[in-house]
């Protein structure tokens, strides 16, 4: 089979590699498309190795058709259209994945577009609901509202009855966020998100943060009493300084989470999250409350260009690579 091989951060080539095969409890997927994530960019640069035992091929989500199943797999069969959450291996013609991380393509969603769903759906649902228990009427602040995660989080939060505030870096992205249901839109280039939240709300009950260190102190300022800051990215750095007094005064919680390194099965596992997404998010997609936001579709041979577009924030929503 062929797959993308990262010879350097700027040289991603489509090459022959050993064939993937379904082991016990696994599903082999003939890939139609792969979603692009910042973790893929970091892995290509040698800064984010895959978990032990995972494929060293880039790619953490795909859509495609079941080609084969390993021993003990009863829920999936050859020919079914599926999408899947991966620990790696997605930028390829075939990928093997634990059966519990496979999802049916949602009703009404094109097969290629479904490649942009597993990572955002699992990240958003696990953090907003399974970790932070976002509820009706609460205020959610999403940094990077025009991103794949941001655009999905807006829709899910609105479906749950929450009020949504977002930050983004252009008027076009802010308008896009409003169309998805964001109530408060803040251009981080020339507005203070802390001041806006204080003006228009009691503060954020929950912040979903991709920035990390750069926003740490201001995120605490933006929280409501008993608020929660959930950090899922480090685009603004890994080391920050925090006034513990402010944290204590607000009875705030700071939570760091990651998806890729979770175990396949058991409590708080990928399988548990995937099944929760299937039970709760897939119906939202089926009835139109949530839809995949695909900002660009490119041939997988252009993976390097896709990575550069993602780093430059030159896309709204997700990028998918077709195989």
Model-derived regions: residue spans:
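C-terminal capping/lid region of NAD(P)-dependent oxidoreductase domains
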Residues: 287-296, 304-323
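NAD(P)H cofactor-binding loop motif with strongest signal on the N-terminal glycine-rich segment
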Residues: 144-145, 211, 234
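Mid-domain Rossmann-like dinucleotide-binding core that forms the NAD(H)/NADP(H) cofactor-binding site
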Residues: 77, 115-190
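Glycine-rich phosphate-binding loop and adjacent beta-alpha segment
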Residues: 168, 214-289, 322-323
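Short amphipathic alpha-helix with an adjacent loop that forms part of the alpha/beta core around
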Residues: 193-201
């Amino acid at each position: 089979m062929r797959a993308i091989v990262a010879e350097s951060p700027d040289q991603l080539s489509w090459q022959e590699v050993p064939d993937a095969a379904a082991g016990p409890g696994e599903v082999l997927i003939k890939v139609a498309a792969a979603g692009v994530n910042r973790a893929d960019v970091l892995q290509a640069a040698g800064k984010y190795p895959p978990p032990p035992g995972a494929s060293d091929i880039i790619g953490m989500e795909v859509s495609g058709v079941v080609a084969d199943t390993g021993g003990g797999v009863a829920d999936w069969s050859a020919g079914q259209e599926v999408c899947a959450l991966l620990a790696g291996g997605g930028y390829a013609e075939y990928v093997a994945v634990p059966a519990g991380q496979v999802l049916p393509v949602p009703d009404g969603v094109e097969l290629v577009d479904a490649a942009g769903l597993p990572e955002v759906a699992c990240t958003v649902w696990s953090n907003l609901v399974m970790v932070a228990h976002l509820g009706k009427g609460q205020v959610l602040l999403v940094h990077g509202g025009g991103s794949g995660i941001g655009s999905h989080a807006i829709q899910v939060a609105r479906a749950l009855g929450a009020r949504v505030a977002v930050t983004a870096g252009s008027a076009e992205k802010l308008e896009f966020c409003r169309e998805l249901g964001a109530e408060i839109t803040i251009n981080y280039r020339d507005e203070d998100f802390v001041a806006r939240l204080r003006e228009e709300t009691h503060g954020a009950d929950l912040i979903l943060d991709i920035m990390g260190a750069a926003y740490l102190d201001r995120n605490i300022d933006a929280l409501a009493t008993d608020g929660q800051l959930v950090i899922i990215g480090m685009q603004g750095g890994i080391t920050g300084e925090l006034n513990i007094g402010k944290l204590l005064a607000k009875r705030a919680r700071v939570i760091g989470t990651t998806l890729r390194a979770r175990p396949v099965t058991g409590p708080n596992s990928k399988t548990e999250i995937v099944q929760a997404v299937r039970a709760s998010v897939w119906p939202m997609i089926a009835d139109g409350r949530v839809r995949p936001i695909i900002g660009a579709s490119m041939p997988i041979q252009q993976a390097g260009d896709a990575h550069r577009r993602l780093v430059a924030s030159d896309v709204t929503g997700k990028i998918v690579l077709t195989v």
